[in-house]
């Protein structure tokens, strides 16, 4: 079995022959943006979301640090999308697939989409794709609310280490 979303996307692209250009230049353009998501966007937006929404106590330093980093990352994407219809160029790719889910919760990340007009246009275009809509519907149907301590413990595991001792 394969784990890690980036590895899964690469496997599926190789298996289907879709969403990853055959040309060396095109392939590495997609790969660099996939790595941008895996090494920067995903971890930073995840931390931003955690400290803004789920942290048991609000820590101003953490909220400000990750909100500012989120804004920087959205600016990077906005600049890239100024001259490109998709993240890695002219065609929809696994880079778009990797980045879109992390940006769906932009409201909870302290982001105003109007500040990133090229990103906003891309975000709306990707969100309008029929397959993306179907995927989002599945997620909405399966997602469980985190209203109680048990649900939060399952997601964040804050006491798991203590239980192992």
Predicted regions and their residues:
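Residue-level signal for nonpolar/aromatic packing positions in well-ordered secondary structure
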Residues: 8, 77, 96-97, 126-132
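Acidic/histidine-enriched, glycine/proline-rich intrinsically disordered or flexible terminal extensions
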Residues: 139-165
